[in-house]
Regions:
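Rossmann-fold NAD(P)-binding glycine/threonine-rich loop
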Residues: 222-223, 231-239
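N-terminal Rossmann-fold NAD(P) dinucleotide-binding loop
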Residues: 148-149
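Glycine-rich Rossmann-fold phosphate-binding loop(s) that bind the pyrophosphate
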Residues: 144-145
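NAD(P)-binding Rossmann-fold cofactor-contacting core
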Residues: 158-183
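N-terminal ligand-binding/catalytic initiation module
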Residues: 1-117, 125, 132-135
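Short acidic low-complexity segments
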Residues: 186-203, 219-220
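Short glycine-/small-residue-rich Rossmann-like dinucleotide-binding loops
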Residues: 210-212, 232-233
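Short helix-loop-beta connector
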Residues: 131-138, 161, 223-224
Length: 239
């Protein structure tokens, strides 16, 4: 019987492929179109709780995408919010398994930490491309972790006119680090502020990327006509 060979890609391998945010956004937009056309199968994800909500959980997320892609697979990803502080590890870690849709054989097993963050950012980017005002100039970013980086990267692709970012995080030093890093990476004005309201007031685009279980953003702070993307386990705006 023929041996089955497949690619194994580490996080470094995945990054080294040269995939950038525009490419990820294009793939996400294609997937949305295929989903609308009924050419996907996207079961509910399975959440594996570990008995203590604050500890973390595992998520199994299978899917099939047809069209020119015609592949199926699963993302197995663990979310442990305290990892960065307690262990110096990413909050989310896991891998993808990608399968041939005609033979069922695995095509690749690859780290999903980086690409999953890119994909989540790309969803906001695609949404902003069609729903945000194209003359948007300012962003409020609530949260300054890994996901906040890819969110802003995708927004800059979708809305090239963005110039200013106000970021708030419960840890001021985290927000300051984010501001320095992203200002240099995207050639934008990025500054940390002392609270969520200062970030949100008058912002053209608002993104929440936290795991808070209480509302953070209030409707009264929102600028009319602004674009709002709530990323995470909870709805973080209070109407």
């Amino acid at each position: 019987m023929q041996d089955i060979e497949f690619l194994y890609l580490t996080r470094a391998d995945v990054i080294a492929t040269g995939v950038d945010m525009q490419m990820v956004m294009d793939a996400v937009e294609d997937s949305f179109r295929l989903h609308h056309a009924g050419q996907t199968n996207l079961p509910w994800k399975t959440v594996l709780d570990l008995g203590e909500r604050e500890r973390g959980r595992g998520n199994a997320m299978p899917a099939y995408v047809g069209g020119e892609y015609d592949v199926f697979g699963i993302k197995w990803i663990a979310g442990f919010p305290k990892n960065p502080v307690l262990h110096g590890l990413p909050r989310a870690t896991g891998f993808f398994v990608l399968n041939d849709s005609w033979k069922g054989i695995p095509l690749a097993i690859m780290d999903c930490t980086w690409l999953s963050a890119m994909r989540t950012g790309a969803v906001t980017g695609v949404g902003a491309k069609y729903l945000a005002r194209m003359d948007s100039e300012s962003v409020a970013m609530i949260g300054a972790g890994v996901q906040a980086r890819t969110q802003l990267e995708a927004l800059k692709v979708a809305l090239p006119g963005l110039q200013q970012v106000r970021v708030y995080d419960i840890r001021r030093e985290t927000a300051e680090t984010y501001a320095t890093e992203m200002a240099e990476k995207l050639s934008m004005e990025v500054r940390a502020v002392d609270n969520a309201e200062l970030a949100v007031r008058d912002a053209d685009v608002v993104v929440t990327v936290t795991v808070a279980d209480e509302p953070i953003v209030k409707d009264a702070w929102m600028k009319p006509g602004s674009f709002f993307s709530a990323v995470g386990s909870y709805q973080e705006e209070e109407f």
